[in-house]
C-alpha cells in the first residue's frame, strides 16, 4: 500500500482525493494526511459537497483533527512550513504537492527532508526537477532515484498525446494553439486588484487573455518539437472543462477521415483511458468529470491544402489531471521498486 499525503487541498487536492475513491485505486493508494491551512470544518464540507463535481458519495465526517472517509482515517494538518511536516513519523511514500506555490526542486526538497520519499508536483515546475511526466507518453523515463517529479499541466496532458500520435503517423512541422480555459481561482468574482491587469476583471463577464507556457511545456515532453509550437490562452466564463484549438502543419498529405481514423485508433489502443475520441455533437459540460486527459472532437476536424490540420480537443482540467496524478504516482513507485 502506497502511503501519500496531500499538501494543499484546493481544487486539485480535493479532486485527487475524490478521484482516488472513484477510480478503484484505493486498494493501491492510501491518503494518510492532508496539510491545509483552512479550517477543518471547511475541509470536510468541501470534500462532501462540490459545485462542479457533485456530492461525494462515501460517508465523511470530522472527528477532532481527523477526517474520516468510511473506515479511512486522514490526519488534518495546518503547517505552513513543509520542512516541519511529520512525514517521517507518518512513513509517507509520496507527497502530492498541490499548493501551486512550491514549484522548484529546492522548495520540494523540504518534503524530502521532512521524511517523504518522493514528491509529485501538480503543476509545471522548474527545469531542475528529476522529470516532467505526461502519463501515457513518457512515464517510462521515471527512474528509482527520482525524488521530485512534475505532472506537467492539464493542458500539456491534453495536447501532448495528440501531437505524439500525429507526429508518429504524419510528421509535425509546426503548430499553433489556442487554449480556451475555464475560469480559475486566481481570477476575480468582481473587479479587484491583481498584478495581471486583465485578471483584475470579473471572471464571469469577460473572455480574458492570460499568459501561457504551454508551448514550452510541449518541448519539455517532446524535445524534438523545440521551437515548432506557439500558444495563446483565454479564460472563459465557465467553471470547468477546457477546449484546445490545435492547428498543425504536417509532413504528409492527409484528409479528415485519415486524421480522425488514426486518432480514434490511438484512443482505443495505446492511449486507451488517456485519450478519447467522439463524433457526437457535444458541448463542454458533457466532458465534466471525464477521467481522460484529452478527447478529440472528430466533428470539428478540418484539413486545408492537405497538410494544415485543425483539431478541437476537450478535457476536464480538474478531473482528468487528478486521475493522471494518481497514475503518475503509481508509475513513480513502480520505477522505485524496479
From Swiss-Prot:
SMART domains xrefs: Gp_dh_N
A Pfam family the protein falls into: Gp_dh_N
EC numbers for this chain: 1.2.1.72
Catalytic activity: D-erythrose 4-phosphate + NAD(+) + H2O = 4-phospho-D-erythronate + NADH + 2 H(+)
Feature type site, description Activates thiol group during catalysis: 181
InterPro entries membership: E4P_DH_bac (IPR006422), GlycerAld/Erythrose_P_DH (IPR020831), GlycerAld_3-P_DH_AS (IPR020830), GlycerAld_3-P_DH_cat (IPR020829), GlycerAld_3-P_DH_NAD(P)-bd (IPR020828), NAD(P)-bd_dom_sf (IPR036291)
Subcellular locations according to the entry: Cytoplasm
Biological process according to GO: pyridoxal phosphate biosynthetic process; pyridoxine biosynthetic process
Pathway linked to the protein: Cofactor biosynthesis; pyridoxine 5'-phosphate biosynthesis; pyridoxine 5'-phosphate from D-erythrose 4-phosphate: step 1/5
Binding residues for NAD(+): 11-12, 317
PROSITE patterns, per the entry: GAPDH
GO CC entries: cytoplasm
Keyword line: Cytoplasm, NAD, Oxidoreductase, Pyridoxine biosynthesis
Active-site positions on this chain: 154 (nucleophile)
Gene Ontology terms, MF aspect: erythrose-4-phosphate dehydrogenase activity; NAD binding
UniProt subunit comment: Homotetramer.
UniProt protein name: D-erythrose-4-phosphate dehydrogenase
Lineage, highest ranks first: Bacteria, Pseudomonadati, Pseudomonadota, Gammaproteobacteria, Alteromonadales
Gene: epd
Amino acid at each position: 500500500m502506497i502511503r501519500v499525503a496531500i499538501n494543499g487541498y484546493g481544487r486539485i487536492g480535493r479532486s485527487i482525493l475524490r478521484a482516488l475513491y472513484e477510480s478503484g485505486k484505493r486498494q493501491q493508494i492510501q491518503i494518510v494526511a492532508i496539510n491545509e491551512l483552512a479550517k477543518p470544518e471547511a475541509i470536510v464540507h468541501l470534500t462532501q459537497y462540490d459545485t462542479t463535481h457533485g456530492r461525494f458519495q462515501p460517508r465523511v465526517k470530522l472527528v477532532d483533527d481527523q477526517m474520516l472517509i468510511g473506515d479511512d482515517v486522514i490526519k488534518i494538518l495546518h503547517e505552513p512550513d513543509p520542512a516541519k511536516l511529520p512525514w517521517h513519523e507518518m512513513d509517507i511514500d509520496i507527497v502530492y504537492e498541490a499548493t501551486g506555490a512550491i514549484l522548484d526542486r529546492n522548495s520540494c526538497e523540504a518534503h524530502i527532508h521532512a521524511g517523504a520519499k518522493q514528491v509529485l508536483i501538480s503543476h509545471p515546475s522548474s527545469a531542475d526537477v528529476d522529470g516532467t511526466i505526461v502519463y501515457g507518453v513518457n512515464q517510462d523515463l521515471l527512474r528509482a532515484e527520482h525524488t521530485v517529479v512534475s505532472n506537467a499541466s492539464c493542458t500539456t496532458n491534453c495536447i501532448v498525446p495528440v501531437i505524439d500520435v500525429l507526429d508518429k503517423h504524419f510528421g509535425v512541422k509546426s503548430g499553433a494553439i489556442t487554449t480556451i480555459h475555464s475560469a480559475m481561482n486566481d481570477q476575480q468574482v468582481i473587479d479587484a486588484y491583481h498584478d495581471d491587469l486583465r485578471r483584475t476583471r470579473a471572471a464571469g463577464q469577460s473572455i480574458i487573455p492570460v499568459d501561457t507556457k504551454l508551448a514550452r511545456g510541449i518541448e519539455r515532453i517532446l524535445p524534438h518539437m523545440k521551437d515548432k509550437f506557439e500558444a495563446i490562452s483565454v479564460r472563459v466564463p465557465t467553471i470547468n472543462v477546457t477546449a484546445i484549438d490545435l492547428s498543425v502543419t504536417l509532413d504528409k498529405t492527409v484528409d479528415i477521415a485519415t486524421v480522425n481514423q488514426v486518432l480514434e485508433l490511438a484512443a482505443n489502443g495505446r492511449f486507451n483511458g488517456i485519450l478519447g475520441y467522439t463524433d457526437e455533437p457535444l458541448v463542454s459540460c458533457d466532458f465534466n468529470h471525464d477521467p481522460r486527459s484529452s478527447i478529440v472532437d472528430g466533428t470539428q476536424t478540418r484539413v486545408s491544402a492537405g497538410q494544415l490540420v485543425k483539431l478541437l480537443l476537450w478535457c476536464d482540467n480538474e478531473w482528468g489531471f487528478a486521475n493522471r496524478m494518481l497514475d503518475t504516482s503509481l508509475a513513480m513507485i513502480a520505477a522505485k521498486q524496479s
